[in-house]
Amino acid sequence: MVHFTPEEKCIISKQWGQVNIDETGGEALGRLLVVYPWTQRFFDNFGNLSSSSAIMGNPKVKAHGKKVLTSFGDAIKNMDNLKGAFAKLSELHCDKLHVDPENFKLLGNVLLIVLATHFGKEFTPEVQAAWQKLVSGVAIALAHKYH
């Protein structure tokens, strides 16, 4: 279980209020699909994923990216109980979708890159450490059903 300090919670909550969910979610998922092309197999109903520009401009990628990033909002509201907050999503990804749990870590790392790009100098090492702890905690929570 991941434990957050009050300072880490404050850092994440403050910065989360500045995140454009639509833009950041679509970019993070799009980058995941481009950088790790084997993840595309989970999105075969998304249409054209044949190139980087096709992926980044794909409305289904953007919509699902928004949905994924919205779930990070739930994580921020439930930082003290990530496992409980993601129990149903863990079950869905394990039992129905059969997603390799390593992909959750990959998405978290891609999200950190996107946040760093968007926030620039505001994304200090302290901020990165707090976000890294959150995305790692979410990945662990999503992988919980696999154990």
UniProtKB/Swiss-Prot annotation:
Hemoglobin epsilon chain is a beta-type chain found in early embryos. One of its GO terms (biological process) is hydrogen peroxide catabolic process. Red blood cells. The modification Phosphoserine is found at residue 51. CDD domains: Hb-beta-like. GO terms for cellular component: blood microparticle; haptoglobin-hemoglobin complex; hemoglobin complex. It comes from the Eukaryota. Belongs to the globin family. Heme b binds at residues 64, 93. Coiled coil: none annotated. The gene is HBE1. Keywords: Heme, Iron, Metal-binding, Oxygen transport, Phosphoprotein, Transport. This is Hemoglobin subunit epsilon. The lineage of its organism: Eukaryota, Metazoa, Chordata, Craniata, Vertebrata. SUPFAM superfamilies: Globin-like (SSF46458). One of its GO terms (molecular function) is heme binding. Residues 3-147 form the Globin domain.
